[in-house]
Amino acid sequence: MAARWADYITPSTLQLAPLLELLLEPVGAAPRLSELQLGLQEALVNAVRHGNGCDPAKCLRVRRIVTPRWLVWQIQDEGPGVPPQARVRHLPQEPAAHTGRGLFLIHHCFDDVRWSPRGNRLQLAARRPRQPAGLIWLSAGLGPSDGDSLDR
């Protein structure tokens, strides 16, 4: 299976349910669906609120990439970017704080989290669950001759 991708451009609003549904389409009923949905929603809300300042004239650009082993989402806003020192992955020290949990949740929900140098593009990756090779071949027409390894 070669990598497949889809690009989405959407106005910077908090009406994210339709976009989330499209982004999660390849996940299906995987055990991690709720976890990935939570992480993606948090990343999208952060991009709208903090990156684009809830300005509907600005857009979010999202790319979904599906490979045999990974599901990857790249979320880019039009903001100035998150500085490296603010890309923390721990909970706020003040338990009553109203903000500061988003990046912690994002890091918890995904297997790999990376930032662009500018800090306005976030890449989130989740390992795909291993499936018996025979089922993959029957459902997708793949086999060893297609370059897909048996040792996923």
For every predicted segment, state its role:
Residues 72-99, 137, 144:
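Glycine-rich/acidic phosphate-handling loop/turn and adjacent ATP-lid/helix
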Residues 59-69:
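Short beta-strand/loop element within the Bergerat-fold HATPase_c
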Residues 1-38, 138-152:
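Bergerat-fold GHKL ATPase/HATPase_c domain
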Residues 88-116, 150:
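ATP phosphate-binding glycine-rich loop and adjacent ATP-lid/helix-beta elements
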Residues 69-73, 120:
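Short beta-strand element(s) in the Bergerat
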Residues 120-129:
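Short C-terminal beta-strand
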Residues 31-56:
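Conserved ATP-binding N-box helix of the HATPase_c
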Residues 129-135:
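Short, charged/polar, Gly/Pro-enriched secondary-structure boundary elements
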